[in-house]
């Protein structure tokens, strides 16, 4: 009797194993035989079922008007794009981009990274700001006139400031002050003028006699003159 029970158990285990093998083969056969059209059809059916389930789960209000059906999921659009041969990554780009031909609004600033014909000089690996046509000039580094090349040329022009140019612009003190501030020579010019004023006062002041002034000694008074007298 124990031998028969063991044989029956072994036979039952073998039968279960054969059933498992058959089901595995059937499952594998059903998956491998299906083509791309079957897979697309199955995905469409699953999407429709999910939409129907969500529509049934929502409580329908009696006052609400029937609205348009919900939009299909983006997975189906991606699958259809793959089926037609177009790259699916185009779906990730926002609508109304530069590729569709829509012009940018006036004043829009965009960054150009490595585009040929637009990046010049040493700013090739960096972001160069460009203003859309029809926009006014923006202040600050976003303006085209403040690119590295123009800044360098502007500094070179400031260094070429000479005494002759200062004499010519002496009639306008605001312009002279602006030139000194831009060139960075404001402090140097102030020290130079103070030294000239002290030397001029020392040369024009009469020598004080010894004992005069009641024994009072102190620094000479310095009178500052207009800038035109020294230049």
Swiss-Prot record:
Quaternary assembly: Binds GSK-3 and prevents GSK-3-dependent phosphorylation.
Annotated signal sequence range: none
Record has Transmembrane as a keyword: no
Biological-process GO terms, alphabetical: canonical Wnt signaling pathway; regulation of protein export from nucleus; Wnt signaling pathway
Identification of the protein by name: GSK-3-binding protein FRAT2
Keyword entries, A-Z: Wnt signaling pathway
Region: Involved in GSK-3 binding, residue numbers: 172-194
Any Pfam family: GSK-3_bind
Family designation: Belongs to the GSK-3-binding protein family.
Function: Positively regulates the Wnt signaling pathway by stabilizing beta-catenin through the association with GSK-3.
GO CC field: cytoplasm; nucleus
Location of the region described as Disordered in the Swiss-Prot/TrEMBL record: 1-24, 53-109, 203-231
Compositionally skewed regions (Acidic residues) per UniProt: 7-23
Natural source organism: Mus musculus
Keyword rRNA-binding assigned: no
């Amino acid at each position: 009797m124990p031998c028969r029970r063991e044989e029956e158990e072994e036979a039952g285990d073998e039968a279960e194993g054969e059933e498992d093998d058959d089901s595995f083969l059937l499952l594998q056969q059903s998956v491998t035989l299906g083509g791309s059209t079957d897979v697309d059809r199955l995905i469409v059916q699953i999407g429709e079922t999910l939409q129907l389930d969500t529509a049934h789960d929502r409580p329908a209000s009696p006052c609400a008007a029937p609205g348009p059906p919900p939009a299909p999921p983006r997975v189906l659009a991606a699958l259809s794009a793959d089926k037609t041969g177009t790259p699916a990554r185009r779906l990730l780009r926002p609508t109304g981009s530069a590729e569709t031909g829509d012009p940018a609004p006036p004043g829009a600033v965009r960054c150009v990274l490595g585009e040929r014909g637009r990046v010049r000089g040493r700013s090739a690996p960096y972001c160069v700001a460009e203003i859309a046509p029809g926009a006014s000039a923006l202040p600050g580094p976003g303006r085209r006139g403040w690119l590295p090349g123009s800044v360098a040329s502007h500094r070179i022009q400031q260094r070429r400031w000479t005494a002759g140019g200062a004499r010519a612009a002496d009639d306008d003190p605001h312009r002279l002050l602006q030139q000194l501030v831009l060139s960075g020579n404001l402090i140097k010019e102030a020290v130079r003028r103070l030294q000239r004023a002290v030397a001029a006062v020392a040369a024009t002041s009469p020598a004080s006699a010894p004992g005069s002034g009641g024994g009072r000694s102190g620094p000479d008074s310095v009178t500052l003159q207009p800038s035109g007298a020294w230049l």
